[in-house]
Structure formats: C-alpha cells, structure tokens
C-alpha cells in the first residue's frame, strides 16, 4: 500500500510540472529526485507521447545526473586493476546507482533507456577529435577512442552523444542530440563507416584533411562550414555572414601546427551573404596548418579575443 501511495504521489508531482516547460527544463527539475530506473521510464512514457521528446528527455537527464569518471583515466598498476575499475560501465544498473561513467557507460545507459522506451538504438565505437587532438591516428590515439549512439526515430537514424551532452552550456549540449551527419563527422569518426550516415563516407585521410570545428562556431550564429578556394594567385577563405555583426574571424597559419602567425595582406570582401578572406598563395608554404580565432566587438570600438582555436585544418 505504501508503494502504491508513493507512486500516486510521484505521478501527481510529475504531472504538476508546467506544460510550458521545455524538455530540458523538465529533465533538470526531475534530476533532483531519487528515482529508480523503472520509475524514470514510466515518467518518460507518462509525460511524453512523441518518441523524439522521450529520447531528448533521457539525453538531458543523463547529462544532468551522470558525471564523467575521470579517475578511470588515471594510470593503473595492472591490466586486471584497470579492467576491474572499468567493468561497471558495462552494466546500466551500476552506472545509474554510481552516477558516474566514461563514454561507453554513457552510451550503454542511454541504449538501455531507449530499449525500454521502444526506441531502436545501437552503440557506435570510434574516435573523436577535439581541441587537444585535431587529427586521428588509429595506432596511437587510443586515449581518443570514444562511444556514442545512433537511435532510430520515425524511420530515420539519428546520432546522439550523451557523453558530450553533459555540458551545462545549453547550446553546446543541444548540439550533440540529433547531430546532422555532416556536422557529426567534424569530430566523430566511427570504426564502421556505415555509421557516418553520409551518402559518401569519408576515409580516415579525408577525415583528417577536413576541418575540425568547435560547436561554438555554430552556436554564435555561423551556419556553414567554411571553404578554402583558390585560383592561380589567391586563396579564398569563404563563409556565410553571421547575423550578429559583432563577431570577427581571424585566420592564422603555421608550418608546424605549433607557432601560428597572422596572414599578411588579407583583403576582406563582403559579397551577397558571404564573407571572403583573400590572400596571396605565394605567402603560404606548401604544407600549412590553419586555425580560426573569433574576436568580438566591445562597445563597437575594440575587438577582444573570445574564442581561440575554433577551426583547425591543414593543406
């Protein structure tokens, strides 16, 4: 009887949530409650009828409640010790109680909830690149191995990374739910190319030659992936204008990917809805690394560096 009464109280408590709250806000409000896994499944089904909302709700709940287990990154004295420390990541129930995981554990827990909610899901294994590691080398980049999910909604596979969705920055967290394949491949390289979900999957070489772009580029208003074009005399770095005109793009180059320098004699051309940075090919070495920094106007007078290493690529 006590269990029945508690279930009724929990139902009415959850039902009292404002109908105007977003899925994210509901997940945040619910994160302070001590729930069983089955209760969270029931609440999700009671609160949402749309599968996309269910998948997003669990994504946010995991982001708010499961912390990354950085201790597992510390060196272990033996392989057995490392395996024992890592083993809980294979068991969703242990992850749920422990409230900690590494990437495989995040994807395993997310997969468990999707299965309980009747949403087809799979775990994708592969590699990631970020600000620390712009280029993936399969033989030496084991520390950048990663796991994420694909879920099938309305007959379409969608990419979800609940590990990277733990960011408290709403814009960054949103980026990793239902990632468009052409944006997911910026940072996520699956071992099975099928899970790139691209019409023409990239080889590892093509992946490493493509641009690494921090999601902040899209969050602050840029909408496309910049392109480097050329003719006999010039390079042209081309991107769509940002509706927020306070931002300024700074393109730098390096021969060793360590020391970067500002380009000389850059001409900025505004053409229709695009910005073009034009510079002489003759000043660029044959093998060159580029990076983009973002400056923002302060009081419409001076520009301050706000985000560095936002885009990295090589030629």
Role assignments for model-derived ranges:
Residues 1-21:
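Bacterial Sec-dependent N-terminal signal peptides
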Residues 12, 62, 66, 70, ...:
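A generic secondary-structure signal for well-formed alpha-helical elements
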Residues 20-102, 112:
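Secondary-structure boundary elements
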Residues 103-107:
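Gly/Ser-rich catalytic serine loop of serine hydrolases
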Residues 108-184:
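Hydrophobic/aromatic-rich core segments of domains that either
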Residues 168-315:
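Alpha-helical and coiled-coil interaction segments, frequently adjacent to or embedded
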